[in-house]
């Protein structure tokens, strides 16, 4: 029924609560959140990374050059379509400033944890 979700290992279709999608470099990161069971403290989630599809398109009508663009891959596009049908996901438009601040906070936490990891490795040397 949901062949694309099944192909990435998602089989608990009825327990999917929501999902998020973000881009980091040349990768799209999909995180699927499941409804938490009564005895769980935190809800379970799965994280998937998909490479972005690269294309060359012609620039403007007058120029003869091409430019590289990246877009969401076809596999991820089909997975999102199935997720939308499961969650009836209605994504509200966020203001650009709010979204940039959220991305910045996420980046800060990723960099901070990576720095701590490198410092621990240096201490062990």
Curated annotation (Swiss-Prot):
Membrane-spanning ranges: none
InterPro entries: UPF0325
NCBIfam families: PRK13677.1
Record-stated family: Belongs to the UPF0325 family.
Protein known as: UPF0325 protein Ping_0715
Source species of the chain: Psychromonas ingrahamii (strain DSM 17664 / CCUG 51855 / 37)
């Amino acid at each position: 029924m949901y062949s694309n979700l099944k192909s990435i290992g998602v089989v608990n279709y009825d327990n999917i609560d929501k999902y998020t999608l973000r881009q980091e470099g040349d990768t799209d990161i999909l995180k699927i959140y499941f409804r938490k069971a009564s005895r769980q403290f935190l809800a379970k989630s799965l994280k998937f990374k998909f490479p972005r599809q690269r294309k060359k398109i012609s620039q403007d009508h007058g120029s003869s050059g091409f430019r590289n663009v990246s877009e969401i891959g076809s596999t991820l596009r089909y997975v999102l379509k199935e997720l939308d049908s499961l969650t009836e996901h209605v994504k509200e438009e966020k203001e650009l400033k709010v979204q940039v601040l959220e991305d910045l906070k996420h980046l800060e936490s990723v960099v901070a944890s990576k720095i701590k990891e490198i410092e621990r490795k240096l201490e062990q040397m």
